[in-house]
């Protein structure tokens, strides 16, 4: 209940956003396997989930288990189509979390008065819609991929961290739940580890509120849900049709979870190539929200600084 009380009011707006975005994603959902929208791994992920195998490093155990569950629960379409529904739900959920995060941030920064409520809801809705229609999120929400689910986990951790930072004395359940989502989300995609940096920063800002017991519980929640990686050696031992590496032994397990074959793609970029890569990233960002969207974002940061 503490979590619910901490969120902005007007849940009907959030529900409307979720249903509208979900309808859009389901309407444009890929009917089966596709390599469009950067979906080169879609066939492998769907087949691995269906057979409960071990996907390419880092293994993606959280995604595989959820995808398998969706393939069993959704009553229509083929296996691949059912798994695509997981991406649509995850993407729509991530959009709603953007709405909640914006509302919470606006309410706690500028006040939750009758005069500002409408403007706050409008601003949060525009932000959520911009995220929903961004080409990358939309494309990853209609195919079998891990990225919309990663967006959902990222949004959940950030919202809970913001909720706790705005009222650290109100209880530690938001922080502990963030640890829970962090551990579970790392079983979906390792890039979630980068969210640990701002989360740690928030904790340092409010370190007086953190007792050894709370820190122990937070680490416990993280470790508990990192245990989802136990799936890999268990299933590798069963010799499924698809099994990358040999996660049944320690060396193969570490090779898989550390994504050893792909480390060079993350940390192997020569320093001389970094400026060009930054330009490419900036171009991707502009194409998601266009120049007007970026201008509005910069304007919002300026307005926030002025208000302080």
Which stretches of residues belong to each language-model region?
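Transmembrane signal-anchor helices characteristic of membrane glycosylation enzymes that use polyprenol
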Residues: 8-38, 47, 131-133, 189, ...
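Transmembrane-helix motifs of polytopic, lipid-linked glycan transferases
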Residues: 85-113, 155-160
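Membrane-interface transmembrane helices that cradle and orient dolichyl/undecaprenyl
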Residues: 106, 110-118, 141, 157-175, ...
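Hydrophobic, aromatic-rich transmembrane alpha-helices
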Residues: 287-308
């Amino acid at each position: 209940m503490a979590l619910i009380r901490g969120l902005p009011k007007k849940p009907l707006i959030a529900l409307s956003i979720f249903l509208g975005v979900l309808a859009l994603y389901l309407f444009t959902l890929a009917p089966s396997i596709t390599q469009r929208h950067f979906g080169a791994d879609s066939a492998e992920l769907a087949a691995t989930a269906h057979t409960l195998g071990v996907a390419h490093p880092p293994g993606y155990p959280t995604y595989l288990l959820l995808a398998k569950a969706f393939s069993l629960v959704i009553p229509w379409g083929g296996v691949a189509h059912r798994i695509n529904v997981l991406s649509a739900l995850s993407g729509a959920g991530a959009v709603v979390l953007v709405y909640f995060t914006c509302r919470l941030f606006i309410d706690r920064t500028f006040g939750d008065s009758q005069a500002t409520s409408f403007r706050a809801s409008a601003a949060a809705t525009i932000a959520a819609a911009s995220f929903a229609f961004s080409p990358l999120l939309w494309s990853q929400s209609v195919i079998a991929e891990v990225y919309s689910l990663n967006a959902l986990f990222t949004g959940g951790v950030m919202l809970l961290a913001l909720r706790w930072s705005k009222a650290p004395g109100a209880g530690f359940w938001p922080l502990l739940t963030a640890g829970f989502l962090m551990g579970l989300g790392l079983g979906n995609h390792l890039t979630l580890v980068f969210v640990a940096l701002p989360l740690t920063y928030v904790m340092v800002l409010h370190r007086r509120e953190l007792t050894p017991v709370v820190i122990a519980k937070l680490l416990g929640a993280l470790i508990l849900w990192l245990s989802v990686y136990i799936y890999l050696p268990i299933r590798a031992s069963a010799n499924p049709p698809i099994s990358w590496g040999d996660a049944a032994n320690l060396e193969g397990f570490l090779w898989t979870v550390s994504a050893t074959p792909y480390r060079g793609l993350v940390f192997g970029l020569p320093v001389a190539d970094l400026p060009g890569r930054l330009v490419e990233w900036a171009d991707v960002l502009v194409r998601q929200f266009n120049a007007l969207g970026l201008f509005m974002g910069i304007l919002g940061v300026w307005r926030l600084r002025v208000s302080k």
